[in-house]
Amino acid sequence: FLYFCVSKQNSAMIEEMLAYNREFVKNEGYKEYITNKYPDKKIAILSCMDTRLTALLPAALGIKNGDVKMIKNAGGVISHPFGSVIRSLLVAIFELGVEEIMVIAHSDCGACHMHSEEMLEKMKARGINADYIHMMSFCGVDFHSWLDGFEDTEKSVRGTVDFIVHHPLIPSD
């Protein structure tokens, strides 16, 4: 694996993970996970990045490594018509043979009831310069639509599915 950490120096937790990885590679622990890049079930799943879903979602769906393309983000939503989620779906469809897309949500999602104003205040409290936030707003970034969560999980999933179904670059077949 190739890895770079965002922080200036690795935390003890990251160092522990990297040490584990070195042993994992040395002992060839990866061999049981070897597969190719094409999903066997020809399915892409858009879901939330919630840590509770890491092992639970594959177990609940009966999928294993190599079965599907998993795309995860906060809330399992599409926040931009030409952002990274749509790009990932296009790559999955046109380059990796995906034929079906599932959108999966879960209860007690952290993106549910998320409010942009609260997040902007947390950013400022962590040292993000208010001038940068203002500059991004001036450049056309609508923080409210970008950072706000959703109030109704089912409505959010239906909206995301509708967005995908009607996207001009997603094939209708």
Task: Show which residues each predicted segment covers.
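Gly/Ser/Thr-rich loops at beta-strand to alpha-helix junctions
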Residues: 49-52, 107-111
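Ordered, amphipathic secondary-structure segments that act as subunit-interaction surfaces
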Residues: 94-106
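Short secondary-structure capping micro-motifs at structural edges
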Residues: 87-93
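Conserved beta-strand-loop surface patch within small alpha/beta domains used
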Residues: 27, 31-86
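Divalent-metal-activated hydrolytic enzyme cores
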Residues: 10-41, 76-83, 95-96, 111-173
